[in-house]
Amino acid sequence: MPRVLLHCCCAPCASSVLEYLTQYFQVTVLWYNPNLYPQAEFDRRFRALVELIEKMGLADKVDILAEPWKNQDYLRRIKGLEDEPEHGLRCTECFRVRLLETARLCKHYGYDYFCSTLTLSRHKNAELINDIGEELARASGTSWLPSDFKKRDGENRSIELCEEHNIYRQLYCGCEYSMRRRIEVGESMGQTPGESTGGAV
């Protein structure tokens, strides 16, 4: 089987993607998400990813390459973009910093492809993510595996898998700015931030 280095942003997005890709690839999951804030949330999401892989019976099929919390990597890249709206230039740089590291490690370890679970969410622009992946692949001499994992009912399947295995599903995308936005929205609706039963925003 060809080998793919799969950047995983969270357990929910990884669920149906792993179910699909492990049929055709030898998958190594890369946990590199310096955008996540605070560190306790970073740690919680990583534990959820490991738990998911175990509960799906993929522990013998999927390797995990995990990097520690490096929030400064993210903050350096988005300097000057702090006030950008959600889905704006700050988010584009967030995609780029994670895929840049994925491309680097793909080259270093000799994987056949690199890819990301980011395209599963309906809140993410798959065309933009694929464009960044292709650009970084050309620059690094690697191969990007294009995807739009939300197709073929991928996002709904991820919800089913998380409910089946009782996997933590976060309420905000991940960075400090999206967390603040979620709190503001929740307060305006009289809600208290907590775990999601309906998927990440």
How would you label these PLM feature ranges?
Residues 1-19, 24-201:
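Nucleotide-activated chemistry modules centered on ATP-dependent adenylation/adenylyltransferase
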